[in-house]
C-alpha cells in the first residue's frame, strides 16, 4: 500500500458505499416522481414531508417535465383559423410587394402535396420510424411540381422573387420552370449526375432518379462521362456530408442572394438544418440590417423568435391566398412542357440497363422502350437518396 493511500479492501468498501448512495438517490428520485404525478389534494402528509425534504429533486423533475412538454408542443402542428390566416397573408403580400430583394428558402413541406413525405412532421419518415411504424411512398419520380412550386416560379417571372434556396433533392423546382441560375439546391438534385474530372464539371440531367446505387460517402452512379469516360457521381449531400460541388448546389449564388436580401420567405422548412448555415442568415450584420423573416410552417421552428411574421398553415393554402392577394394567376404544371425533357441527356447504347428506376414520360400513357419501372403504387422506400435517409435514421434508432 502506498504511503497515505487506501488499501484494496478500503477502495472496494468506498466503492460499495458510493453505489449504495447512488441507488438510494435513484430510489428517492423515483418516489418523488411518483408523488409529483399525483394531484396535490391526493398526497399524504408523509408524501408532503418527503417533497419538502427533496426540494432539489422536485426542481429537477419539474424542469425535466417542462422540457418534455416543450418538445412535445414543438412537434405539434398548429393551424391559424381561416380569418387569422387571411389577415397574415395580407401582411405577407404587402411585404412581397415592398421587398427590394426577396429570397425564398424551401423545405420538404412544399413537396408533401406531391406525395413526397417529409422527415420531421407528424407523419414524417423519421417520426413514423421512431414510433416503430413502417414507411412507404409512391415512386418519387411520379411526383409533380405543386401549387407552391408553380407559384414561386410565377413570382420569379414577375421579378417579385429574386432567388430560391432549397433543401429538397426532388428536382421539382427545376421541373416547375424555375431557371437554373435562380435555384440553389443545397442538398443536390435526384435527376442530376456529374463528371468531376471534366473542367468545368460536366452535368448530365436524366429523366430518372440517378441515386439508386449511391449512399453516404458512396456517390458513383455506375455510368460514365460521355467525354472522358470517368465514373459519374450523384449530386446528393447526405446527412453528415459537406457539399463541394458547384452545381446544382450553387452555394455561391445562395450566399450572394442572402447578403443582398432585405426579405426572406421560408416555406415548409423546419429550419433545423438551414439554421446551421450562418451564410444564409447574415449574422455578421447588425440586427437592424438583417433581412425581415417570414415563416410558413405548421410546426415550431428555431427561427420563430426572429420572424417578423409566422403563418401556421399548409404551404399550398398560404400560396393560393397570397397569389390571389397579389392578383397573380398560378400557372398549371404541364408534363408536356416540363423543362427536364429538353435539359436531359439520353442514355447511350448499352446504358439502358444501368438503372431500374421508373423514367419520366411526357404523358402518363407513354412509356420509353426498355423502361422497367413499376406503375405508381405505395411501397416501402428502398435505396436512393430518400431511402438512404430512412435507413440511416433506422440505424440511429437501433443504436439509441
From Swiss-Prot:
Tell me where in this chain the PTM Omega-N-methylarginine is found. Answer: 388
Q: Which GO terms describe its molecular function?
A: chromatin binding; histone H3K18 deacetylase activity, NAD-dependent; hydrolase activity; metal ion binding; NAD+ binding; NAD-dependent protein lysine deacetylase activity; NAD-dependent protein-lysine depropionylase activity; protein methyltransferase activity
InterPro entries for the chain:
DHS-like_NAD/FAD-binding_dom, NAD-dep_sirtuin_deacylases, Sirtuin, Ssirtuin_cat_dom
- EC number(s) per entry: 2.3.1.286, 2.3.1.-
Spell out the catalytic residues: 187 (proton acceptor)
User: Regulation of activity: what does the record state?
Assistant: NAD-dependent protein-lysine deacetylase and deacylase activities are activated by nucleic acids. Histone deacetylase activity is activated by DNA and nucleosomes. Protein-lysine deacylase activity is activated by RNA. H3K18Ac histone deacetylase activity is inhibited by methylation at Arg-388. H3K18Ac histone deacetylase activity is inhibited by deubiquitination by USP7.
PROSITE patterns attached here? SIRTUIN
* Cofactor(s) listed: Zn(2+)
UniProt keywords, alphabetically: Chromatin regulator, Chromosome, Cytoplasm, DNA damage, DNA repair, Hydrolase, Metal-binding, Methylation, NAD, Nucleus, Phosphoprotein, Repressor, Transcription, Transcription regulation, Transferase, Ubl conjugation, Zinc
Its quaternary structure?
Answer: Interacts with UBTF and the RNA polymerase I complex. Interacts with components of the B-WICH complex, such as MYBBP1A, SMARCA5/SNF2H and BAZ1B/WSTF. Interacts with ELK4, leading to stabilization at target promoters for H3K18Ac deacetylation. Interacts with histone H2A and/or histone H2B. Interacts with DNMT1. Interacts with SIRT1.
Give the similarity note.
Answer: Belongs to the sirtuin family. Class IV subfamily.
Protein name listed in UniProt: NAD-dependent protein deacetylase sirtuin-7
The uppermost taxa in this organism's lineage are: Eukaryota, Metazoa, Chordata, Craniata, Vertebrata
| Name of the gene this protein is made from | SIRT7
Amino acid at each position: 500500500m502506498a504511503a497515505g493511500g487506501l488499501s484494496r479492501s478500503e477502495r472496494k468498501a468506498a466503492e460499495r458505499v458510493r453505489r449504495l448512495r447512488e441507488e438510494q438517490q435513484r430510489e428517492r428520485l423515483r418516489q418523488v416522481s411518483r408523488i409529483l404525478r399525483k394531484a396535490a389534494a391526493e398526497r399524504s402528509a408523509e408524501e408532503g414531508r418527503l417533497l419538502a425534504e427533496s426540494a432539489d429533486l422536485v426542481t429537477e423533475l419539474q424542469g425535466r417535465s417542462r422540457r418534455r412538454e416543450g418538445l412535445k408542443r414543438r412537434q405539434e402542428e398548429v393551424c391559424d383559423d381561416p380569418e387569422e390566416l387571411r389577415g397574415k397573408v395580407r401582411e405577407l403580400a404587402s411585404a412581397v410587394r415592398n421587398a427590394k430583394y426577396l429570397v425564398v428558402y424551401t423545405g420538404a413541406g412544399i413537396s408533401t402535396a406531391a406525395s413526397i413525405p417529409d422527415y420531421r412532421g407528424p407523419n414524417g419518415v423519421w417520426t413514423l420510424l421512431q414510433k416503430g411504424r413502417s414507411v412507404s411512398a409512391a415512386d418519387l419520380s411520379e411526383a409533380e411540381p405543386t401549387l407552391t412550386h408553380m407559384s414561386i416560379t410565377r413570382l420569379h417571372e414577375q421579378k417579385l422573387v429574386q432567388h430560391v434556396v432549397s433543401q429538397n433533392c426532388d428536382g421539382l423546382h427545376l421541373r416547375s420552370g424555375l431557371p437554373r441560375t435562380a435555384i440553389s439546391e443545397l442538398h443536390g438534385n435526384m435527376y442530376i449526375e456529374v463528371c468531376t474530372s471534366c473542367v468545368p464539371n460536366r452535368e448530365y440531367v436524366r429523366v430518372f432518379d440517378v441515386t439508386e446505387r449511391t449512399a453516404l460517402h458512396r456517390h458513383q452512379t455506375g455510368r460514365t462521362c460521355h467525354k472522358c469516360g470517368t465514373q459519374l457521381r450523384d449530386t446528393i449531400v447526405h446527412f453528415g456530408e459537406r457539399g463541394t460541388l458547384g452545381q446544382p448546389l450553387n452555394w455561391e449564388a445562395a450566399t450572394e442572394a442572402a447578403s443582398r436580401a432585405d426579405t426572406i420567405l421560408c416555406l415548409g422548412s423546419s429550419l433545423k438544418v438551414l439554421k446551421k448555415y450562418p451564410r444564409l442568415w447574415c449574422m455578421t450584420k447588425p440586427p437592424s440590417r438583417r433581412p425581415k423573416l417570414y415563416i410558413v410552417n405548421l410546426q415550431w421552428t428555431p427561427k420563430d423568435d426572429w420572424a417578423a411574421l409566422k403563418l401556421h398553415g399548409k404551404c399550398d393554402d398560404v400560396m393560393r391566398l397570397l397569389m390571389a392577394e397579389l392578383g397573380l394567376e398560378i400557372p398549371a404544371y404541364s408534363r408536356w412542357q416540363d423543362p427536364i425533357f429538353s435539359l436531359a441527356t439520353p442514355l447511350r447504347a448499352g446504358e439502358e440497363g444501368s438503372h431500374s428506376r421508373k423514367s419520366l414520360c411526357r404523358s402518363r400513357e407513354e412509356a420509353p422502350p426498355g423502361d422497367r419501372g413499376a406503375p405508381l403504387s405505395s411501397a416501402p422506400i428502398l435505396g436512393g437518396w430518400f431511402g438512404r435517409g430512412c435507413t440511416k435514421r433506422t440505424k440511429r434508432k437501433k443504436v439509441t
